[in-house]
Amino acid sequence: MKFWKLKMNDRNYLLVSVRREHMRDVTLCSEQMQQEHQSFVGSIGKEDIRFQIVEDAAPVGICSLEAVCCLGFWYMKQFEKDTCRIRLQEQACRMKCFRNLVTLEIREHDTYCMPQAYEIQDAMHFSTPEGFESLIPIYRKAYHEDLLHKIAVGVSRGGKSLLRWSNNKIYLSAPVYMDYEGIVRKM
């Protein structure tokens, strides 16, 4: 079994591939997901990565953007690509990678869960309450209410994500780091 530890916005993600020779079916888990007894499985077919929650086979929602970015980053590094397509709730979005900076394209008209509280610091910065991972609905609402410019830095726990607005699409950019990788052998 091969494993990789990735880091994004000060959160750790563990990626495991049981079939080492193919690396087409991988399972992703984080500390927060472990507390909620959840893990994702990502199936890679041709140029697509499809996600679903392991425990109930439900499709993964857009709220787990950090996990999506980590798996996309891993895929592009393993297969030496600079772009890939991600499927979330049967909707495709594109992801690009330059060195360790991952950019995910998100459609503006898609629906997202709206957190109850958000705080605009100034026209370029906004923060989310502790425990909220998704910056997209906050950014979308603030942009439409003319509280933010086209580019904003979202401050999340331990890190920052850059959000950019262009052609009715939102682009989320954030650095992802490969902490280490290894192999677990059966004894």
Region locations from a protein language model:
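A glycine-rich beta-to-alpha transition motif near the start of alpha/beta enzyme domains, typified by
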Residues: 1-99, 115-187
